């Protein structure tokens, strides 16, 4: 039989509440020596001990609600609104339940804006990932969790107090209710939930809901065929409450992609903290629990994870060349993430059999580095601080893991878990995080580094085997690794930024903000805090009596989409939107960029190569890809980015690269023909979709609408989305989309085929075989499935475009180096590459860059690059 780890996930909020009422009739009997009520603590402990003995989990996580306000209350303000006040006697015990859990060696977790259900659902899905081997048991008092049952996950619902549970599996759910897990969500959507205070459909209870689902299969199918129902009050209610039914469906659906900051490693069961737990039992008056604890401990106290021992040698000085083999791994440790500002604190190298660690950084100058590492780019930059130029390695475990799967992070602890290459504590456990980051004792530091080397060495063979099986080994050797070297050079070079220019722009913005503030006060008739959503809501919706768009638990929504809908109704709203835009530029980009300028007068951003699902690059510290360009105040920020002396900035931008990729992979003859003949693709689309015979008759508005259709289709836009973007009716938008597919049938065929492929394989690929998993492609929930289908359609397009850009950067770097040009790559932003070019090289470099980028890959249509130069990034764009 397959040996699986056992993960126990407990809905702490739900179970603790039930524990409180399980012994509520005896509440006066359960008091600590200091007078604290302990009935909930005692009952929770009893339940937990019973579960631990029965299930014998290897991993445990107890999730709690973080508060009343969640993303669901933003969707529906009255969500859980009808609940009675939480008893004070229960509320006072909750912190002690959490303290007890910690002392039992069990992890608990809560996440702002999310419920315990979402934390559990997210971890449950993590446990279903490839190369992860868990049986999952979920314990809760909330039936919503039933939607999570599957072949690996069972849900136990507490029935009476905390002693009796009803176990749900897919077979039991089908036998008991005639439903699949996905249909259970639709049942909640129809009948509502009085506990969570959402209504569903008027007068539809469990019996009627079950009948409807057994007939129609799903909520979506029911509403697609609602006209087939015979005339009745129920039919009227279904039609009248359609919007609420689908909202209830969303409210009932557990978010399995919550942004939790823990992984399955964090749920590994630790030993009990016997001394601390014994003292806690004394404080609570739990003599029986203490006696059992001490009997189990047998005088031995431990709170450490049981892990295998590891041998390593500490190197302090002397020659190390004989200790380094080419096929070893090496790893450089820093405290912080921004390696442009951090120094190496220790390093390690070796293989699964022999590992060396050291804090003597001078030894690095004598090292012939091995050919395997983790995060080559980071290492290249760090070693440049020591005037060491690290040669390109043959294997980077971080990049290999990223290519294999983008659904998890790429930390070494994650690699250890996924590729079964040993136990590794997380960096947060060793170093802390945030303001509490600090170096541990040398013994702890050295062991942690040694374990990293061992994990990497053991994982490499398995990772390479998977890359070969997926036909992705070339992506590592020919694309991601060479690109890492190019990006490292770009980061080290940096781009010059004028602080004076930023300060001048900042002064202009402050004047505009002051002027706008006065105008807003005049239009509002009084002064108020424009940055306060609460005060702004009162002004707009109470004083000025503008129509209320959305309402949240804390008041009126003043989100951008709400204000945009109101802009035509009052001049003050337009001024507020303008104020917000300029204020955002001022705080994020003017004030935010100045501290990022290094002593050399440059900004050295960090390119994140292993983050996005599509393969696109992103940048941090600072993020230079998000500088707003639609607003003039945002574009002006680029005036501060300047070339080196006697040079210009050259901006080379791929023209409509994603549409060209779409033409290639769809094979649509009309789209291909338009690009081959150099036609303006948006004008061409306007003619074909809007029935305009001559190009000269296409108006600017026609072209703008056609552009929205072209790019909307790439992102799988709906008729609703297109109607909103263009300010037209949904009927007209639907007609545009249908006509588009009639005129470009190859695109329609591509979209149908790629969705079918995603359903069959569970993933889609770029032209270079870069994979993106589409886990929700077969989801029963219409909205979830629809998003997955749009992702499947867009990912090969966006990912292939990203790959082309990477190839161009690699080839361009090679060309510059081969001919000893002084010109340097500086930035990569979206589809644009920016170079610093000495004036004497300008003519030659412009030809070289354009040719290199346009010949990066051969498509069915030509690639086109637009070039501009300037004394600032603003001028070059």
Curated annotation (Swiss-Prot):
Keyword Hydrolase: yes or no? yes
Q: Which residue numbers delimit the 5'-3' exonuclease domain?
A: 180-270
Q: Which SMART domains match?
A: 35EXOc, 53EXOc, HhH2, POLAc
Q: What is its EC number?
A: 2.7.7.7
Keyword annotations for this protein? DNA damage, DNA repair, DNA replication, DNA-binding, DNA-directed DNA polymerase, Exonuclease, Hydrolase, Nuclease, Nucleotidyltransferase, Transferase
Q: Name one GO molecular function term.
A: 5'-3' exonuclease activity
**A Pfam family matched in the record:** 5_3_exonuc_N
What is its biological role?
In addition to polymerase activity, this DNA polymerase exhibits 3'-5' and 5'-3' exonuclease activity.
Name-wise, this protein is DNA polymerase I
Q: Which GO terms describe its biological process?
A: DNA-templated DNA replication; double-strand break repair
Q: Which InterPro entries match?
A: 3'-5'_exonuclease_dom, 5-3_exonucl_a-hlix_arch_N, 5-3_exonuclease, 5-3_exonuclease_C_sf, DNA-dir_DNA_pol_A_CS, DNA-dir_DNA_pol_A_palm_dom, DNA/RNA_pol_sf, DNA_polI_exonuclease
Q: Which domain of life is it from?
A: Bacteria
């Amino acid at each position: 039989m397959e040996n699986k780890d056992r993960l126990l996930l407990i809905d702490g909020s739900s179970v603790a509440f039930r524990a409180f009422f399980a012994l509520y009739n005896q509440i006066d009997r359960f008091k600590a020596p200091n007078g604290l009520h302990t009935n909930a603590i005692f009952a929770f402990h009893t339940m937990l001990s019973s579960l631990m003995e029965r299930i014998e989990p290897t991993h445990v996580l107890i999730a709690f609600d973080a508060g009343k306000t969640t993303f669901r209350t933003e969707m529906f303000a009255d969500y859980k609104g009808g609940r009675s006040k939480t008893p004070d006697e229960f509320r006072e015990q909750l912190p002690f339940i959490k303290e007890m859990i910690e002392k039992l060696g069990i992890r608990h977790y809560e996440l702002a804006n999310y419920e315990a259900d979402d934390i559990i659902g997210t971890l449950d899905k993590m446990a279903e990932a490839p190369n992860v081997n868990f049986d999952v048991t979920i314990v809760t008092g909330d039936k919503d969790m039933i939607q999570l049952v599957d072949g690996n996950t069972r849900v136990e619902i507490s029935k009476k107090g905390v002693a009796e549970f009803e176990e749900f599996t897919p077979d039991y759910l089908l036998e008991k209710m005639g439903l699949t897990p996905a249909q259970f969500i639709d049942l909640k959507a129809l009948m509502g939930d009085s506990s969570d205070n959402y209504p569903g459909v008027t007068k539809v209870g469990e019996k009627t809901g079950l009948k409807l689902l057994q007939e129609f299969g799903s909520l979506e199918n029911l509403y697609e065929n609602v006209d087939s129902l015979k005339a009745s009050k129920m039919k009227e209610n279904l039609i009248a409450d359609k919007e609420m039914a689908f909202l209830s469906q969303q409210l009932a659906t557990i978010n399995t992609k919550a942004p939790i900051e823990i992984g399955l490693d964090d749920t590994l069961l630790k030993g009990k903290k016997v001394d601390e737990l014994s003292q806690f039992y004394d404080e609570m008056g739990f003599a029986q629990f203490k006696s059992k604890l001490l009997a189990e401990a047998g005088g031995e106290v431990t709170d450490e994870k049981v892990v295998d021992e590891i041998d390593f040698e500490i190197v302090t000085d002397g020659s190390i060349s004989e200790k380094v083999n080419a096929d070893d791994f090496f790893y450089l440790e820093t405290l912080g993430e921004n390696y442009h500002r951090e120094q190496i604190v220790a390093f390690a190298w070796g293989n699964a059999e022999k590992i060396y660690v050291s804090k003597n950084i001078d030894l690095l100058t004598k090292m012939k580095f091995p050919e395997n590492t983790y995060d080559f780019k980071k290492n290249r930059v760090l070693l440049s601080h020591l005037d060491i130029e690290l040669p390109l390695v043959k294997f980077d475990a971080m990049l290999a893991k990223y290519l294999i799967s983008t659904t998890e992070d790429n930390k070494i602890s994650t690699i250890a878990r996924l590729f079964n290459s040993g136990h590794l504590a997380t960096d947060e456990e060793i170093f802390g995080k945030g303001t509490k980051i600090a170096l541990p004792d040398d013994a702890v530091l050295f062991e942690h580094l040694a374990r990293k080397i061992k994990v990497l060495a053991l994982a490499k063979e398995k990772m390479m085997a998977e890359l070969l099986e997926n036909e992705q080994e070339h992506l590592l050797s020919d694309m991601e690794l060479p690109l890492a070297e190019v990006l490292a050079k770009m980061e080290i070079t940096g781009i010059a930024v004028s602080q004076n220019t930023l300060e001048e722009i900042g002064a202009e913005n402050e004047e505009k903000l002051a002027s706008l503030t006065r105008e807003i006060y005049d239009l509002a008739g009084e002064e108020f805090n424009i940055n306060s959503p609460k005060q702004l809501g009162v002004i707009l919706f109470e004083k000025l009596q503008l129509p209320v768009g959305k309402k949240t638990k804390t008041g009126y929504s003043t989100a951008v989409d709400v204000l945009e809908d109101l802009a035509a109704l009052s001049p003050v709203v337009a001024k507020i939107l303008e104020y917000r835009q300029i204020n955002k530029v001022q705080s994020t980009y003017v004030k935010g960029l100045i501290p990022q300028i290094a002593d050399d007068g440059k900004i050295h951003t960090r390119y994140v190569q292993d983050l996005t699902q599509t393969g696109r690059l992103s940048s941090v510290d600072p993020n230079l890809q998000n500088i707003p360009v639609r607003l003039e105040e945002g574009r002006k920020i680029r005036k501060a980015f300047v070339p080196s002396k006697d040079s210009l900035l050259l901006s080379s931008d791929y023209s409509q690269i994603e549409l060209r990729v779409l033409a290639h992979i769809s094979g649509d003859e009309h789209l291909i023909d338009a690009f081959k003949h150099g036609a303006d693709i948006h004008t061409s689309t306007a003619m074909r979709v809007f029935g305009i015979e001559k190009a000269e008759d296409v108006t600017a508005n026609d072209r703008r609408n056609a552009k929205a259709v072209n790019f909307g289709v790439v992102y799988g836009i709906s008729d609703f989305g297109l109607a909103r973007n263009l300010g037209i009716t949904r009927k007209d938008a639907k007609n545009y989309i249908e006509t588009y597919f009639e005129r470009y049938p190859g695109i329609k065929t591509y979209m149908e085929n790629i969705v079918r492929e995603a359903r069959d394989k569970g993933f889609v690929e770029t032209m270079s075989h870069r994979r993106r998993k589409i886990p929700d492609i077969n989801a029963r929930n219409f909205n979830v499935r629809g998003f997955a289908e749009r992702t499947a359609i867009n990912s090969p397009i966006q990912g292939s475009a990203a790959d082309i850009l990477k190839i161009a950067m690699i080839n361009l770097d090679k060309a510059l180096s081969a001919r000893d040009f002084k010109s340097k790559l500086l930035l990569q932003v979206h589809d644009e590459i920016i170079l610093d070019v000495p004036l004497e090289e300008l003519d030659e470099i412009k030809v070289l860059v354009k040719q290199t980028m346009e010949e990066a890959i051969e498509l069915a249509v030509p690639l086109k690059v637009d070039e501009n130069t300037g004394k600032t990034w603003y001028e070059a764009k």
